Structure formats: structure tokens, C-alpha cells
Amino acid sequence: MIIPSIDLSNGKVVQLQQGKNKVIERDDPLQLAEQFSRFGEIAVIDIDAAKQQGENRDLIKQLCRRYDCRVGGGIRNVEQAEAFIQQGAVKIIVGTAAFTGVGVNEPFLSALAKRIGKNRIIIALDHIKGKVVTDGWQQETGIEFRQVIKQLEKYAGEFLFTCVEKEGMLQGTDLEAVGQLRSLSDIPVTVAGGVNSLEEVTRISAMNCHIQLGMALYQNIFSLEESFIASLDFNKGLLPTIVQDASGQVLMLAYSSRESLQKMFKSERGTYYSRSRKNIWVKGETSGNIQQFRKIRMDCDRDALLMTVSQKGVACHTESYSCFGDRQFRPETLQQIVKQRLQTAAPDSYTASLNQTALAGKIMEEAQELIEAETEAEVIWEAADLFYFMTVLLSRKNISFELVFRELDRRNKTKDKR
């Protein structure tokens, strides 16, 4: 997995060399996150909090509400970690707090694992020549990472392994040290610091490690799309590619090659490799039933893909919406219909005629009717009415069901379950 990094300082996106010299500053964190999220999780690092020179928590909260973020930087107690989880972070990165002056801070890590779960904890092994550094990489501990791996494994769902002396330098990472860590532990490892070529991306991925990228992306050494392709395992040939729509309904099974993925990322149209014709083909090129690329994920073995698209028309050559049957009616389906009617604004469209005042009145009315409904049929009928008007309200405010469901999922993952 490729994990792009958004490092924050004073509300801006920055890139530092060895955690010190700032060489890049941008003011578009939300736009970057939208772009990065198409490929999976994002690492969001609060540089100011790590150095105890401020914090960027409000901005991080915004990012966590919309995207799958692993959050780190200055998390020094259980309460801070739990707060980020409650705000929507999928994982927490802890570094400084995981160590004392002479070893592992087991009381803290034990309490953290009990509070948020071991699977959500990423322990940062920030090191200079094999020795752990803390406090924004400013403090040397003298602790050899090799000596504490087994002790840390009890509390970690993953390690973030950063070669600090190479961080931001674009001189290549320490592959020997990565190999040593990989030989010592079987839990997931994310490698960061100095990655400077697609060849290196391929080598690290083949070591069964994730890769966190920063400077190489921001300096345009290579693109996120290129690094995603480089991390895949093509040793068995073409990659099976499951294609689904935004609601999660499977549309078709296709196959991808390096070249088809390159073309797809460039055109943002569903593009695949035909095993029968032995060439690259673009979905909808002749029929007009095109697929707009939205996001992509690789599986755990890096040899299969799950791609989400916006489907125009139908996906199957039989004129069925999906190669696996007709379209399923889901909340996203209803919202798509509502948005179309709002955009078209036909004179005879009841949906388009609903102004804010009328819409508010109908929601209040239908909510009351749902409360008063008695039979099963009445409850279903009134719930459907309320759901429809709620969908119109969300659509007018340009809020997707995806964001609503993310909020419900966030609440479900916190300790205060309802």
C-alpha cells in the first residue's frame, strides 16, 4: 500500500529535510487529501505538536471526518489518542510517548491498547543509524530498535519505520535496516524516509512493506499513480480487477496491466486489458457507457484490485446495469435521481419545486407522521417519505450519503456507542 503524507505546520502542508529545514510549503491540505484519498489511507502528521510548538487539531479533525487518516505527531497521552479516534482517525501513530529515556513505555502502551485497541496503534520507530529518536526527532534515546521490537509487538498493530537521516533528502532509504526489521517482526511495517525512485518502491513492496511518501511526491520525482503501479505484484501476469459503483454494487470483473492502469490514471476513464483480444480497451468507447474513475485499492497480496467508478448507462454488454444483475436501489441511487432532478429543474418536477421553507415543513410533517404510524405498512410508508425529503435536503447542501455513513461509522468505533 502506498500512503501519501500530509505534514502540517501552522495550518499549511510542509515538507522538511531531516525534520528541520523546510523546503516546501503549500496551503491546500483539503484539496491534497481529496486527491490522495483515491488511493487509500493518508498519513496526517502534526509537525507543530511533535515539536511542542503549537498544534493543528482543528484541521486534522476536518480531514478525519472525510478521509481515512492515520494521525501522528505530538500524541503523548491516551486521551489525545482517543480524541483523534473519536474524530474519525482510523489509526494513531505514537512515537515519543512509546519510549522512556531508557526503554519502552509499557504502562502507556498498555493503557493505550486497552482504550483504543492494539489494531489501531502504529508505533513510530524513528531512528538515526538504528537508534530511536523522539520529540520531533530532536532527542536521541540510545535505544536500538532491534532490541525492543519483541517488546513493542505486544502493543502495536503496525510499525512506522523512518530513517531520519534520509528523511526528505531523496537519497534512498536504508533497505538493509528495513530488511532487519522485517526479519524480526511479522506485523505490518510502513517504511518512510528518503524513497527516491520507483525501483525502490517496487523493492520495498516486495519486502511486504507499505510505503509512506512525502518529498518524492511533492517534488514530482514520481507521481502517486506511478508509485501505486510500481508497488503492485505483476509476477503472475494481469491483475483481476473488481469494478464497483459508489454504492458498492459490483459492476464487472476485468483485468489490468501496467499499461492499462497508466492509461486509466491519465484519462480517468475505466480502462482494462482484454484477455481475448490481447489489447487495452476503454469501457464505453463505442457504446458510450463510460466509467469515470473515482478510487482504487489493492488487496493484501498486491495482485488484485478493487476500483470504484461512476457508471454512465450500463456496465454489461447484455444491457444490464451490472454483469451480476440489475441495479440495486440504495440510498446513493435515490440521491443520484434527486440530484438529476434538481439540476434539470423541470417545471413539472416536484423535487425541484421544493424550496428551503417547503422542504423544512415536509421534513417536520413526515417525522411526526412516522412517530404516529402504527402498522408495519404505515411505518415503512412514512419512513420512506421522510427518507426522500431528507435526501433532497442533503442533496441541496451537497452532502453525500458517504459522509453521513462515515459519521455513523465514526460513532460506532468510539467507546460511547449508542
Language model: regions and residue ranges:
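C-terminal helical cap(s) of enzyme catalytic domains, especially alpha/beta-barrels
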Residues: 103-115, 182, 201-229
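Catalytic domains of carbohydrate-active enzymes, especially glycoside hydrolases
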Residues: 33-45, 87, 153-155, 159
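Conserved anion-binding
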Residues: 8-22, 85, 89-167
